[in-house]
């Protein structure tokens, strides 16, 4: 749910 937005997976 928005992991790239939260910069946890990107």
From Swiss-Prot:
Keyword check for Disulfide bond: yes
Main location: secreted
UniProtKB keywords: Disulfide bond, Secreted, Toxin
One cellular-component annotation, GO: extracellular region
Processing after translation: Contains 2 disulfide bonds that can be either 'C1-C3, C2-C4' or 'C1-C4, C2-C3', since these disulfide connectivities have been observed for conotoxins with cysteine framework V (for examples, see AC P0DQQ7 and AC P81755).
Key word Glycoprotein present: no
Locations listed in the record: Secreted
Tissue: Expressed by the venom duct.
Molecular function terms, GO-annotated: toxin activity
UniProt similarity note: Belongs to the conotoxin T superfamily.
Domain notes: The cysteine framework is V (CC-CC).
Protein name as annotated: Conotoxin ar5d
Organism of origin: Conus araneosus (Cobweb cone)
Lineage, highest ranks first: Eukaryota, Metazoa, Spiralia, Lophotrochozoa, Mollusca
């Amino acid at each position: 749910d928005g992991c790239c937005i939260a910069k946890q997976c990107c």
